[in-house]
Amino acid sequence: MKIIKKIFLAVVMLFAFASCMNGPINLTGSAAPINPSQKKVLVAYFPEYSAKWRDDLELSFESRKWKVNEIDFWEVEKANLRKRNETFLIVVDKMIKEDYKSFLGGTFFSGNISVYDLRTGNKIINYNFHTEESFDVTTRLAKALGGLVTK
């Protein structure tokens, strides 16, 4: 009977762990593959909590050899983005900081991140998230865009 309880507990723990994990960020639109030389992103951060998101996003992308440039959040609509060298525009919209921290000390946020392909002007990612760590979000975002790079 003890062994059955342990197996049952292990199965319940496995389901609990699996349900808490967030999956990969998927492309909502179509984007053509890019060359490694095109690994350039332009980022617009909403001013609130921008330092935290800037640090995490730069770490996630620069560790994967992406070039990260910034533009003022309020200048995005005015700028002629097609004349820039970057391939993608990442807009980190207003974030809501949750009241609690993770086990390892990370900060949880809820909000929205949009990614636009500057070659076509199309939105390729619209990621609404709730109660996730900023570093986890930026890492999955870097992996999603990294999937477009051809070798």
What are these regions (language model features)?
Residues 2, 27-31, 75-78:
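A generic local structural motif
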Residues 13, 34-36, 106:
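Generic structural signal for beta-strand residues in well-ordered domains
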Residues 46, 50-54, 104-106, 130-138:
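Solvent-exposed, acidic/flexible segments
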